[in-house]
Amino acid sequence: MRRISSSQRRRLFFTFSAIVLSLGLVGTTVVALNYDSLRAQYLKLTTLDFEGPGEGEVVVRIESGDDGLLVTQKLLDAGVIRDFDSFYRLLIDSNAVFYPGSFMMKLRMSNKAAYEVLSSASNAMTYKVTIPEGFRAVQIFEELSKITGIPSAEFRSVAEDLSGFGIPDEAKTIEGYLFPATYSFDTQATAKDILGAMVSRMKQELERQGVEQKNWHSTLTLASIVQREAKLEPDFYKVSRVFANRIEIGMKLETDPTITYSYSGKDMSEVSRAEQIKHGYNTYIIEGLPPGPIASPGALALEATLNPVDGDWLFFVTINLESGETKFSRTLAEHESHVVFLRQWERENPNWYDD
């Protein structure tokens, strides 16, 4: 049997030692890897917060008056946040302010991400509706229905209860009391909520312009006529002056928009004179103001009605329906000379009334 030399024994020793050391290092690495993996799993199971912006979608409804405890519970129940206490502490530390509304959120959101959504009113889900100046109630109901999906008949039905909106007793309908503007309504808003907001906005405008409540109805009535007649901003104040002058001398207003008006939307120009007299809105027939507004006046029409420019005009006619150019006159003869320009424009634009 061959004997191993001392030099060979030394080489074997070092080789064996290296193998043992390598195995030890591998074992240590495996243990370390297992520890890191287990630790990550443990933290994932025990952490008090989700990571990131979340996933999926869920709507959370915040009501007016909800406090931090209730808001936190709603988020927890909806699966938005993971832990009640940690989110509630965030609210306390942030001096949180909440805004009522419906918020589109995600499932499994981090506390910070969830808080950022709720802390801004602009994140609430809303309907944006623009009601132009001069729209009549029937048009407003249709526009609101188109945007919100609430049937126009429901708006009309809700509008019948005038006492619920604090409208003056002399008003027979809600016509004229719905302020024309751009609104953002909560997606959960009812027909009554929406109309109530519009009436409140009109009241605010009347108060801002210094109109006493006893004069609300008459002011809105005249302003609605000014709104339907005037085309260009400077002319609002002149049209207002024409009507003020006519009222002062007991002259009929004789304004075309009152001929067609009815709350239901029916064109009253197509009914008999007897029906028009009974209806009471045709200012070519009645004396003074009609029973109520014929449309929703905006801020400009209200201001012009309250502050007509100085002048002694009794007549006006828009001679260019496209540009809105309007002529004002003191006498009937002067007025009729201006009407000639309108007739000429109509001949040059024969399809205008069909568009």
Regions found by a protein language model. Give the residues of each.
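Conserved catalytic or metal-liganding residues and their short signature motifs at active sites
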Residues: 1-254, 297-300, 304-312, 320-355
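Conserved SxxK-family serine transpeptidase/carboxypeptidase catalytic domain
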Residues: 251-301
